[in-house]
A protein has these predicted regions:
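An N-terminal, well-structured beta->alpha segment
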Residues: 4-105, 194-231
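Gly/Ser/Thr-enriched, mixed-charge loops and adjacent short helices
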Residues: 13, 35-40, 44, 153-285, ...
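Conserved phosphate/anionic-ligand binding catalytic regions in large, soluble enzymes, centered on
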Residues: 40-60, 145-148, 234, 238-250, ...
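Short glycine-rich or small-residue beta-strand-to-loop segments that form or flank ligand, phosphate
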Residues: 87-93, 233-236, 412, 551
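N-terminal small/polar loop signature for handling phosphorylated ligands or for N-terminal nucleophile
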Residues: 89-152, 255-313
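Short Gly/Thr/Asp-enriched flexible loops that form oxyanion-binding sites at enzyme active sites
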Residues: 101-109, 152-159, 309-329, 365
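Glycine-rich phosphate-binding loop plus the immediately following alpha-helix
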Residues: 158-188, 329-352, 357-366, 422, ...
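Phosphate-binding and adjacent anionic-ligand microenvironments
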Residues: 294, 298-300, 322-324, 342-538, ...
Length: 576
């Protein structure tokens, strides 16, 4: 019989399995029934980014016990696949408890007879993806909550191709985790014993050389960089995360000399003392970087999130002297067009090239891909599905991957890794900036040229945060309402068709014709609107949020902005 949240709480407070510090934290909650319920009403669940939750005691929190339990389920699955000798690579970011969680995961795997390769200190998430492939591991783990607030941590699982887990592995691992119902089923061992048995292995700094070498291979015109380096000023902040060493190293080795790092944010620190939310998508994270940019008169300003898989960009508009914030769509399309154009020019474009993006990423990608005779493949939200496509291309030979991007500031050039990679994005964007600087243009000038050529595409995102069990239920109710009462019009836009990825149906509202979406089942609703507009609704896979995405195509930037605002208003008013 399943215990209720109260019984589970009492068990955690009294069972000798749990340490005294955990018990004390929980006893201090006595009388706060809502907090107790929130900590114990469910197990943390996998979403698009794996396991993620607030750090603390409880089944619905990130702690050594939930990490071990998750890892035991993973271990059982690996053993069923006979993957124990291949082993598991493990990395972590700068967050509170990240090193401890990484070590606990390793020792749980070791106790199950599975080899582990743990990075000796914090590393970017994409380097872990590369390590899984390079070391021939069956799986990988990254302890990170990416760009979430400081109270959070998380646990992402990768499979042997180096991408985050997708079907069938994600469902199968979940099923194994669900079977670990008693903590007595969870194995662990002492580090000394694990080392003595050759199970607990450390990855040192020499491995970084291999990773950096892969990044540098993606450069198309390295010869331009030394020529422009002295005139190009770059401001960079790692936002207290893992990006500082690899980003600065790859820029230095390519020949960029004018790189200014935000001193106050250089050191890894899981409390993120200078930012409330260490996310390059949040303008509040840019205060110190923009201050430094103005002091040194920087050409471009860059920020990576704590696990260095996302890149944010600001660039100077020389006409006004102001810095313009680029969305992930804008920076991604600048890199994408540069790669497609220059690889075509230099004769290095593979046969049947493909650009891969998520369904909520800009429609400009379709126009750019068409210009360079490149297939555009759309996948569900989450970079793991882009990684999955690369594997599919490898297996079938249908296409050759050239570049992949998502609107949420993530992209990947090359196939050495299978997750979004901020160090390679920094490197490519700085090369793009040097290329245009040689022509007397800024990145903003280049972006305006793209708008002129392909159309004024503009995208937006509105997010509603609803925490706790009440929030979870409200989000479900909102999705149910959209399904039961599908809109025929959103603002000034007629709905031409809608896609319900959960039900695997696309319905044309004019003809009533239905067809498959062609993508896996996911709790996502997508509305195709007239005039090249669209919007999409989905609950976040990693946070207590519901997200509304919008996209339009205008005749000018002003026209696109007006259309976007109208769509945003219509969609969020329906929600309210």
């Amino acid at each position: 019989m399943t215990m209720g949240y109260r019984e589970t709480y009492e068990m955690w407070c009294t069972d000798p399995y749990f340490d005294d510090k955990t018990k004390e934290e929980l006893r201090n909650l006595a009388g706060d029934e809502k907090e107790i319920e929130d900590r114990f009403y469910r197990q943390l669940e996998f979403g698009t980014g794996g396991l993620r939750g607030m750090i603390g005691a409880g089944t619905n929190r990130m702690n050594i016990y939930t990490v071990r339990q998750e890892t035991q389920g993973l271990a059982n699955y690996i053993l069923a696949q006979n993957g124990q000798d291949k082993g598991v690579a493990i990395a972590h970011d700068s967050r509170i408890m990240s090193p401890e969680f990484a070590r606990e995961a390793a020792l749980c795997l070791n106790a199950n007879g599975i080899k582990t390769y743990l990075f000796e200190s914090l590393r970017p998430t994409p380097e872990l993806s590369f390590a899984v492939r390079e070391l021939g591991c069956i799986s990988g783990i990254v302890i990170t909550a990416s760009h979430n607030p400081r109270e959070y941590n998380g646990y992402k699982v990768y499979w042997e191709d180096g991408a985050q887990i997708t079907p069938p592995h994600d469902k199968n691992i979940l099923a194994e985790v669900a079977k670990v119902t008693e903590f007595s089923m969870v194995k662990t061992m002492e580090e000394d014993a694990a080392r003595a048995e050759g199970l607990f292995n450390i990855i040192g700094t020499d491995f970084d050389d291999k990773y950096i070498a892969q990044l540098k291979k993606q450069s198309i015109h390295p010869e331009i960089i030394p020529e422009m380096a002295k005139d190009m000023k770059i401001v960079y902040t790692p936002l207290h995360g893992t990006g500082n060493i690899p980003v600065r190293r790859v820029l230095r080795e390519l020949g960029f000399t004018q790189v200014y790092v935000v001193e106050e944010q250089k050191k890894p620190d899981g409390t993120f003392p200078t930012v409330p939310y260490p996310n390059p998508e949040d303008e509040n994270a840019w205060t110190l970087a923009m201050k430094l940019a103005k002091e040194v008169d920087a050409d471009i300003v860059l920020a990576t999130d704590p696990d260095a898989d996302r890149l944010g960009v600001h660039t100077k508009d020389t006409k006004t002297g102001e810095y313009i914030s680029f969305t992930g769509n804008m920076s991604g399309m600048l890199i994408a067009e540069y790669i497609l154009r220059e690889r075509t020019k230099t004769g290095t474009m593979p046969e049947n090239p493909a650009l891969v993006e998520t369904i909520v990423t800009t429609d400009m990608a379709k126009a750019v891909a068409a210009e360079y005779n490149t297939a555009l493949i759309e996948v569900l939200t989450g970079f793991k599905y882009i990684g999955e496509q690369i594997r599919h291309f490898d297996e079938t030979g249908a296409h050759h991957y050239v570049f992949g991007l998502e609107e949420s500031y993530g992209c990947l050039a090359g196939t050495y890794a299978r997750d979004k990679d901020a160090p390679v994005a920094v490197m490519m964007l700085c090369e793009v900036a040097a290329y245009y600087k040689k022509q007397g243009k800024t990145l903003w000038d280049a972006m305006l040229d793209m708008y002129e050529k392909y159309g004024y595409y503009k995208e937006g995102l509105a997010t509603v945060t609803l925490k706790g069990i009440d929030g979870f239920q409200k989000i479900q109710a909102m999705m149910d309402d959209f399904r039961q009462n599908p809109p025929k019009k959103l603002g000034d836009f007629e709905v031409l068709a809608y896609r319900d990825y959960k039900e695997d149906v696309r319905k044309d509202l004019a003809t009533g014709k239905t067809e498959s979406t062609g993508l896996p089942a996911s709790n996502v609703l997508y509305y195709e609107l007239e005039d090249n507009a669209w919007c999409c609704v989905r609950p976040s896979g990693t946070e207590p949020k519901i997200k509304f995405y919008f996209g339009v195509k205008g005749t000018s930037l002003e026209d696109a902005s007006e259309k976007l605002e109208g769509l945003r208003k219509a969609m969020t008013e329906k929600e309210a």
